[in-house]
Regions:
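Non-heme Fe(II)/2-oxoglutarate
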Residues: 1-53
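A short glycine-rich, His/Asp/Glu-containing loop-to-beta-strand
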Residues: 47-68
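A short beta-loop-beta micro-motif enriched in histidine and acidic residues
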Residues: 55-56, 69-83
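Short, conserved beta-strand element in jelly-roll/cupin
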Residues: 62-64, 77-94
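Tight coil/turn sites that cap or link beta-strands
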Residues: 65-67, 107-108, 116
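Short beta-strand His + acidic residue motifs that chelate non-heme Fe in jelly-roll/DSBH
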Residues: 70-72, 94-96, 113-114, 118-126, ...
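A short hydrophobic beta-strand segment most commonly corresponding to one strand
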Residues: 82-87, 110-112, 126-137
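A short beta-strand-loop-beta hairpin characteristic of the jelly-roll/cupin
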Residues: 87-107
């Protein structure tokens, strides 16, 4: 289950626009991840209060309209790392599966989850679902 740890109360729209600017010229179908170095440098100063610790890895996870991230386990996760998700954009038709439980997350919410448990996401809505994903230790 994703566990709520806080809320980002600042302006979300500039962060969403920044996320779109980092997306390579993709077809905007299915899902994509952006592992650009600039993700951490651009977002860490904003979220350091909510997500403390050393940012080991950060990336954007985007699911386009009618896209899915199939059930999986992140086997490349460091044992000492903690994974947080910042929901930059979502809609009422986005659902998250974690360890057998489905739930919906809220825009601006910051959540922790265990990536070593089976998880997946679907976006049946019309807009994109964008998360900033941060691993800390």
């Amino acid at each position: 289950m994703y566990h709520w740890i806080g809320t980002y109360d600042g302006p979300i729209r500039p962060l969403v626009e920044q996320a779109y600017s980092l997306v390579p010229g993709a077809s905007r179908e299915g899902y994509c991840t952006v592992h650009d170095f600039s993700v951490g440098t651009q977002y860490a100063p904003i979220f350091q209060q909510i997500i403390p610790g050393h940012w080991v890895r950060s990336f954007l996870s985007i699911i386009w309209h009618n896209g899915t991230i199939p059930p999986h386990i992140d086997t490349d996760m460091r044992e000492d790392a903690i994974r947080s998700h910042v929901v930059l954009d979502t809609n009422a038709e986005c659902w998250y599966l974690h360890d057998g439980q489905w739930q919906q997350l809220q825009t601006g919410g910051v959540y922790r989850m265990d990536p070593l448990k089976i998880h997946a996401s679907v976006n049946w809505g019309h807009g994109a679902r964008i998360h900033l994903v941060v691993d800390t230790n």
